[in-house]
Amino acid sequence: MIVKTKEEVVGTPREIFAPNGHWISRRYLLAGEGMGFSFHETIILAGTKTHIHYQNHLEAVFCVQGRGEVELIPSGERFLIEEGVMYALDKHDEHYLSASEEMRLICVFNPPLQGNEVHDEKGVYPLKKGQ
């Protein structure tokens, strides 16, 4: 059984800060735990808009706090994200994630992240060796 507390993640290499300052990702489960997915708590900072395109991963997201929106590219279709809303990027959907107020999101990735991935210039988490 795997049990991790917030105190075991915050301030360690499992807490990743976006280079652009838009988000903080606390990675509780990673590929090395062998679960077949990774599990994260992600904080999206208020007033930010982030381009994301997970070409190599599927992601499901559940909002537990805050408010924002997902805007699909290129259609421009928008979805309100607030407490109690789940969205799943089941088609590797390219999108913008905007936060009108700070959001706290619970995220699951498949394949699992290895640990320190950040979005590249195209909004992608590159695959690492073994994925």
From Swiss-Prot:
Pfam families: Ectoine_synth. CDD domains: cupin_EctC. The gene is ectC. One of its GO terms (biological process) is ectoine biosynthetic process. NCBIfam families: PRK13290.1 (NF009806). Gene3D superfamilies: Jelly Rolls. InterPro entries: Ectoine_synth (IPR010462), RmlC-like_jellyroll (IPR014710), RmlC_Cupin_sf (IPR011051). Its EC number is 4.2.1.108. SUPFAM superfamilies: RmlC-like cupins. The keyword NAD does not apply. Keywords: Lyase. Belongs to the ectoine synthase family. This is L-ectoine synthase. GO terms for molecular function: ectoine synthase activity. The keyword Nucleus does not apply. It comes from Wolinella succinogenes (strain ATCC 29543 / DSM 1740 / CCUG 13145 / JCM 31913 / LMG 7466 / NCTC 11488 / FDC 602W). Pathway: Amine and polyamine biosynthesis; ectoine biosynthesis; L-ectoine from L-aspartate 4-semialdehyde: step 3/3. It is an enzyme of class 4 (lyase). It comes from the Bacteria.
